[in-house]
């Protein structure tokens, strides 16, 4: 399974990348806007830090607007993946871009049919949202399982990026269900390395060692 960082904070990306567990980065307009910096500059900086797919999202609403934006964004770096919203216009854009060899990440997927349509249109990645589905009482894990089953049954090349990840339990569950990737907010990465028993165990080891060395 691959781990992507769901942030545009360059310093956080740089620090977490040192752990050796980061395979890519995802961003969206909300994440970029929080940084208050130029979109292209931020994406290019991230590409220099992480050697893997870096998702950058279009903001146009029509297929024509998305395609024009995507062609420009794709020129920024070979690792850039263009994020496209799951709409009819987004599917049109994905179809054109996939034929041009531009990698796409179709986002805001909440149903099996949406994921299937995105894969049929040629999406490189599809991004079902875990936390947001839970918010409305839906079962995000069944969605992940169903999408993975369809990929395996029909041989689609698309990979599942489990998005809207909020807890370590989310990561653990989607890993067991076969999501290819979990994209994780930077604060959660630190929490995933921690457990009170680990902290207490290390403290005991150090105390025992200090007593032994006296």
From Swiss-Prot:
Instruction: Name the reaction it catalyses.
Output: D-sedoheptulose 7-phosphate + D-glyceraldehyde 3-phosphate = D-erythrose 4-phosphate + beta-D-fructose 6-phosphate
Q: Which residues form the active site?
A: 83
Q: In which pathway does it act?
A: Carbohydrate degradation; pentose phosphate pathway; D-glyceraldehyde 3-phosphate and beta-D-fructose 6-phosphate from D-ribose 5-phosphate and D-xylulose 5-phosphate (non-oxidative stage): step 2/3
Q: State the compartments where it is located.
A: Cytoplasm
A GO molecular-function annotation: transaldolase activity
Q: Spell out the Gene3D superfamilies in the cross-references.
A: Aldolase class I (3.20.20.70)
Annotated GO biological processes are: carbohydrate metabolic process; pentose-phosphate shunt
Enzyme Commission number, as recorded: 2.2.1.2
**Disulfides per UniProt:** none
| CC terms in the record's Gene Ontology section | cytoplasm
Keywords of this protein's UniProt record, alphabetized? Cytoplasm, Pentose shunt, Schiff base, Transferase
Its biological purpose is as follows: Transaldolase is important for the balance of metabolites in the pentose-phosphate pathway.
Provide the family line. Belongs to the transaldolase family. Type 3B subfamily.
The protein here is known as Probable transaldolase
Q: From which organism does this entry originate?
A: Streptococcus equi subsp. equi (strain 4047)
């Amino acid at each position: 399974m691959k781990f992507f960082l769901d942030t545009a904070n360059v310093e956080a990306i740089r620090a977490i990348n040192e752990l050796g567990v980061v395979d890519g980065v995802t961003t969206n307009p909300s994440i970029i806007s929080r940084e208050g910096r130029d979109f292209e500059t931020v994406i290019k900086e991230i590409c220099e830090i992480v050697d893997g797919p870096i998702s950058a999202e279009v903001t146009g609403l029509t297929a024509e607007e998305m395609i024009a934006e995507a062609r420009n964004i794709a020129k920024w770096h070979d690792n850039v993946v263009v994020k496209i919203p799951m709409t009819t216009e987004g599917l049109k854009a994905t179809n054109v871009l996939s034929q041009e060899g531009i990698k796409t990440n179709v986002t805001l997927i909440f149903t099996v049919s949406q994921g299937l349509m995105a894969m049929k249109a040629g999406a490189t990645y599809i991004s079902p949202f875990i936390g947001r589905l839970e918010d409305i009482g839906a079962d995000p894990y069944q969605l992940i399982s169903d999408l993975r089953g369809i990929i395996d049954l029909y041989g689609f090349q698309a990979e599942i990026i489990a998005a809207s990840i909020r807890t370590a339990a989310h990561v653990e569950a989607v890993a067991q269900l076969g999501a290819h990737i979990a994209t994780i907010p930077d604060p959660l990465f630190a929490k995933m390395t921690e457990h009170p028993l680990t902290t207490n165990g290390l403290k005991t080891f150090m105390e025992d060692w200090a007593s032994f060395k006296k």
